[in-house]
Amino acid sequence: MLLIVLCAACNDPYDGDTFVVFDTQPAATYLSSRSEDFSEWIHIMKYADLYNAVNQATQRFTLFVPNNTAVQEFYTRRGVSSIEELGTEYARNLVSYHIIQDTINQATFIEKEGALAKRTVSDDVLMVSFGSAENGGGGMRSVYLNSEAHVLEFANPVSNGYVYVLGNTLT
């Protein structure tokens, strides 16, 4: 009799409800949600075996991600049609050059021209520069990394850091 009473008294008021733990996704999942923009870079990250590495919940990252057009232009400059022609080691170095294992928010990123305080996973320094008004620049539309990669989007938040979108691939 007691068992019947206990079973009847167990009603879950949240039964059937869906709960979201995070309203943002980890870095690689975010890129996949925008595959129309980043499918080429996702392919490079997977080929380099670094795609899942930037999905870790216990680590913080800042990713500088070239869009598909930027990756295609990079291939053209290198005289190849895919990352496989350059090899796995090259791909790992390339992806590592585009990742900082720490967070850099937008305010810190644009704070001053010059070297970012944190180094990339490949232990390189990235330099922030601002285009001049005389060259059609000025403001947020004229921010570059290493004077070669135009920053198109700043500090898109992900659950484990930030994603910056580049109009050029860092080399």
Model-based region annotation:
Residues 1-3:
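Sec-dependent signal peptide recognition
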Residues 6-33:
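Bacterial Sec-dependent N-terminal signal peptides
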Residues 29-77:
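Post-signal-peptide N-terminal segment of Sec-exported extracytoplasmic proteins
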Residues 59-62, 124-126, 141, 152-154, ...:
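Envelope-exposed proteins and targeting segments
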Residues 64-74, 156-171:
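FKBP-type peptidyl-prolyl cis-trans isomerase
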